[in-house]
Amino acid sequence: MEDYNKMAHAVGSGFHMNPSPGNIKDGLITDAIKSAGACKKGGTAPVVDVLDYTEPATKAGLSLVCTPGNDVEATTGKAASGATLILFTTGLGTPTGNPVCPVIKIATNTKLANKMSDIIDINTGDIIDGIKTIEQMGEEILEYCIVAASGEVIPKAVQLQQDDFIPWKRGVSL
């Protein structure tokens, strides 16, 4: 964050539009909260490495990739770093995929999952709705990843040919 902030200020920009209005509406009022939430989505496994954009993962375990906030630039960077599946959580319904790596879209709420069922693979709103525990949902996500990786199920972004690909140009991208 510090390096990115310096880069933004060097070209006369900053984080005044980040988090986005949609993020703020949903409670992500600072970059720190947004970043902490992104890290938490990795679960309880220890972070073994923090990678620069497109830097190849070389260690077994959970690595974080420093990407811009733009969804397509972020998924492109993760695929370039070696991701073989991208689990993309969304509370607003970003319709994105990747031509190199299957993107599994995970809705954070049931309203979104129902409204955009054509692009959502997994609804984690069942946790908030009291239908499933975090552990049960984790098992469901793991099972989906296994069948998607084996080709038994094709994620909706792949079915819909949502082949979005935008490399980050190393400028300021919020």
Please tell me what each predicted stretch does:
Residues 1-174:
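Anaerobic metallocofactor- and corrinoid-dependent redox/one-carbon enzyme cores
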